[in-house]
């Protein structure tokens, strides 16, 4: 059985402190190689990170958690990403239960009654099974996205999944993300042009009002702020 790759997270973060995102990505693939996967939500940050990754590892494995509840615009974006990056190993990871099976087992509109359970069934459990094949995973988290993400480092211990989480974009602002997208003419979700800065499942995402933070449109009628992937 292969041994997992271990790193001293504090030492690595000190070494990477003054490095840029591309340096972090290069370090990640040099360290983990094929044992590293990018879990992409197909948000604006995801488009930037895919583009940066393609410069280092064009055939990198990338997974998207297909909950079956995403906007049609999100699925359309996935096809455009495949066209732009044909070497990318993009895999859609599905839950065990279809929406119909989930409704039969747990009742209709579970996302309204028990959003944490819905996220667990359709996101957390599938991701946990997928990450078991890898030693580390990459994420497009940024510190200024929300108060829950302000302490994110380049390299993080991920107790939730027993893994290492690498976040190359922690210092980027929303403005810098969009400058990069426009400069390189990257594909992006059309909903971003309709006041959706953060896009998740269709049932749990609304447009954001002026003055709200980027993730205010996620689970807006509940106290929930994260799906559980980054806690």
Curated annotation (Swiss-Prot):
Instruction: Return the broad EC class.
Output: oxidoreductase
Return the Pfam families for the record.
PAPS_reduct
Query: Which pathway does the protein contribute to?
Result: Sulfur metabolism; hydrogen sulfide biosynthesis; sulfite from sulfate
Tell me where it resides. Answer: Cytoplasm
Q: Give the residues annotated as active site.
A: 227 (nucleophile)
**Cofactor(s) required, per the database record:** [4Fe-4S] cluster
CDD domains in the cross-refs: PAPS_reductase
EC number per UniProt: 1.8.4.10
Q: Which GO terms describe its cellular component?
A: cytoplasm
**Which GO molecular-function terms appear in the entry?**
4 iron, 4 sulfur cluster binding; adenylyl-sulfate reductase (thioredoxin) activity; metal ion binding; phosphoadenylyl-sulfate reductase (thioredoxin) activity
Origin, by domain of life? Bacteria
Q: Which reaction does it catalyse?
A: [thioredoxin]-disulfide + sulfite + AMP + 2 H(+) = adenosine 5'-phosphosulfate + [thioredoxin]-dithiol
This entry's comment on the bound cofactor is: Binds 1 [4Fe-4S] cluster per subunit.
The GO biological-process annotations, alphabetized, read as: cysteine biosynthetic process; hydrogen sulfide biosynthetic process; sulfate assimilation, phosphoadenylyl sulfate reduction by phosphoadenylyl-sulfate reductase (thioredoxin)
The cross-references to Gene3D superfamilies, in alphabetical order and at most eight, read:
HUPs
Q: Which residues bind [4Fe-4S] cluster?
A: 118-119, 201, 204
Functionally, this protein is described as follows: Catalyzes the formation of sulfite from adenosine 5'-phosphosulfate (APS) using thioredoxin as an electron donor.
Q: Which family does the similarity line name?
A: Belongs to the PAPS reductase family. CysH subfamily.
Name of the molecule in the record: Adenosine 5'-phosphosulfate reductase
Higher taxonomy: Bacteria, Bacillati, Bacillota, Bacilli, Bacillales
């Amino acid at each position: 059985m292969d041994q997992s790759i271990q790193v001293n997270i504090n030492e690595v973060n000190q070494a990477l402190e003054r490095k840029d995102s591309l340096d972090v990505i290069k370090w990640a693939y040099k360290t983990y190689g094929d044992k590293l996967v990018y879990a992409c939500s197909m948000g604006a940050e995801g488009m930037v990170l895919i583009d940066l990754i393609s410069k280092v590892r064009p055939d990198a494995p990338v997974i998207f958690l297909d909950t079956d509840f995403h906007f049609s615009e999100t699925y359309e974006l996935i096809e455009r990403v495949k066209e732009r990056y044909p070497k990318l190993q993009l895999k859609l990871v599905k839950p065990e239960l279809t929406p119909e099976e989930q409704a039969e087992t747990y009742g209709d509109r579970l996302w309204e009654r028990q959003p944490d359970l819905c996220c667990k069934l359709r996101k957390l459990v599938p991701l946990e099974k997928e990450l078991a094949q890898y030693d580390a995973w990459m994420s497009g988290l940024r510190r200024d996205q929300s108060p829950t993400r302000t302490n994110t480092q380049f390299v993080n211990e991920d107790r939730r999944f027993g893994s290492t989480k690498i976040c190359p974009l922690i210092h980027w602002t929303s403005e810098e993300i969009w400058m990069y997208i426009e400069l390189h003419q990257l594909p992006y979700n059309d909903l971003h042009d309709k006041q959706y800065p953060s896009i998740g499942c269709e049932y749990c995402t609304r447009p954001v009002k002026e003055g709200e933070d980027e993730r205010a449109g996620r689970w807006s009628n509940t106290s929930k702020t994260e799906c559980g992937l980054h806690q």
